[in-house]
Amino acid sequence: NLMMRFVEIIMAIPSLIYIILLMVVMGPGIKTIIIAIAATEWTSMALIVRGEVLRLKEQEYVMAAINLGASPSWIIIKHLIPNAMGQIIVRITMDVPRVIFTEAFLSFLGIGVPAPFASLGSLVLDGYRLLSNGAHLFIIPAFFISLVTLAFNLLGDGLRDALDPRLRK
């Protein structure tokens, strides 16, 4: 319960504020972006995993393993992790577009990936600055961000349909 209260406190403030604050404190860079995004994105995964484990804990096969004297670590390894893995994989594929968009947004603001490295957000920013020279410099990276986001959302939706036993017919 203590960890969930901590997660709720972190989730009460928009993650973009945390990320921008960490970017300002730690300076721009790829490592900083990875740390900043990972420091905020784990909270939604924690809620999903907790809910799934609480649901699985009430299943008959888990209760049978407990009654037969199985150790908690054995139950976690043999029952909870394999049965929660589908939800975890689906959640990861649904989180990837948000992470890509967050990184692109930070780079568009100029606090993301530094200049020698390419980023979708920095490409959109460069295209925006040169919009009068050619709209394609702005449209192509923006379209690619949309395409990647759509692809990962469709992948996550397909994986959810394939891995969720409640949706199987």
Predicted segment positions?
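Transmembrane helix boundary and interhelical loop/hinge segments in multi-pass membrane proteins
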Residues: 52-61, 159-166
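C-terminal transmembrane helix and the adjacent membrane-cytosol boundary/short C-terminal tail
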Residues: 26, 30, 39-40, 86-94, ...
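Amphipathic cytosolic juxtamembrane alpha-helices at the membrane-cytosol interface
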Residues: 2-4, 54-58, 62-90
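Glycine-rich helix-loop "coupling/hinge" segments at transmembrane-helix boundaries
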Residues: 11, 22-27, 37, 53, ...
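Hydrophobic/aromatic positions within or immediately flanking transmembrane alpha-helices
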Residues: 17, 33-36, 63, 75-76, ...
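A short glycine-centered flexible hinge/capping loop motif at secondary-structure junctions
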Residues: 68-70, 114-116, 166
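Generic hydrophobic transmembrane alpha-helix motif, especially the helices
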Residues: 1-55
